[in-house]
Amino acid sequence: MIRIAVDAMGGDVGPDVTVPASLAFLSGHPEAALVLVGQPDVLAAHPQYALLQSHPRCQFVAASEVVTMDDPIEIALRRKKNSSMRVAMNQVKEGVAQAAVSAGNTGALMAIARYVLKTMEGIDRPAIATQLPNAAGGATTVLDLGANVDCTADHLLQFAVMGSALVAAISGKPAPSVGLLNIGEEAIKGSEIIKKAGDLLRSASISGDLNFYGNVEGNDIFKGTTDIVVCDGFVGNVALKASEGLASMIGGFIKAEFSRNILTKFAAIVAYPVLTAFKNRVDHRRYNGAALLGLQGLVFKSHGSADAFAFERALNRAYDAARNNLLERVRERIAHAAPLLLVAAQMAPASDGVSAVSSMAVDPAVSTPAH
């Protein structure tokens, strides 16, 4: 049975989302169990608490502190050692749970997860990976989305290896295609780091470590040109936020046009099935749940403003990852690519100008395509 640790206090509203989402998840997954971590008095006050308390596949672990969405990383990591977020990570470290899910502060989550679980051998920095809907009817996995704003070429190679393992585990594709986000498809375009990363990815493709498609542009994310798009966290976060803004604007335009007069309102009724199908395809809640790749344990980040439906989707992603042995698949991919990763690391500059801490987890709202 797969057991998932839930930071029940994380997110904008905590138990008001995590409790009903947990109930729905347990109902739909008879072979899964949950460990809800949080403040006992707060959880007990929720109207659905009794249903979880009496559930045979749910247990509670007490935590006296909560990491707020505004807490600096230092406070969350060094002062709140009994926070629900940290205790949830401990459940994974101790083998009680196979994965953890939190909707809390992204920076704090990344720091705590990295401190408690440590990074895998061969990986310098964890990356945030999530899915964005594409025109091909599926989803494109994009990483990094904000954990690392400054990356070297070997970091991008590491992201590609981890992203390939993620997509292979969840989608069943043995060799998912990888694209390197750039300002053009030609190999001569882009910064020196991107050019070098392209060379490394091509070498990895030749050696069988990756299925490298080549350079892709921003619009390829939504075309579904490749299964995976790799970029640094700065570029990934900008692309994510731009797509969110565009989706919101289009939705607003459609609503405004159908509300213009009595005729357009009638047209909206006629078009309701089509509009509903469109909404479902682009509904960001369906893609909630970003993987923190590169850790020695499975951790998934839900958006802080997620509702119960969206948080349940994050639980689903964590369950699928654990069920499909994502952690072991990432390890295997890294081990297979170890010679190339070692060479790439030796070629990297001694210092990339920023510390690992200052370049990680800079945006507390980057982890999923939602707002």
Swiss-Prot record:
Pfam families: FA_synthesis. Keywords: Cytoplasm, Lipid biosynthesis, Lipid metabolism, Phospholipid biosynthesis, Phospholipid metabolism, Transferase. One of its GO terms (biological process) is fatty acid biosynthetic process. It is an enzyme of class 2 (transferase). The keyword Cytoplasm applies. GO terms for molecular function: phosphate:acyl-[acyl carrier protein] acyltransferase activity. Its EC number is 2.3.1.274. Its main location: cytoplasm. Catalyzes the reversible formation of acyl-phosphate (acyl-PO(4)) from acyl-[acyl-carrier-protein] (acyl-ACP). This enzyme utilizes acyl-ACP as fatty acyl donor, but not acyl-CoA. This is Phosphate acyltransferase.
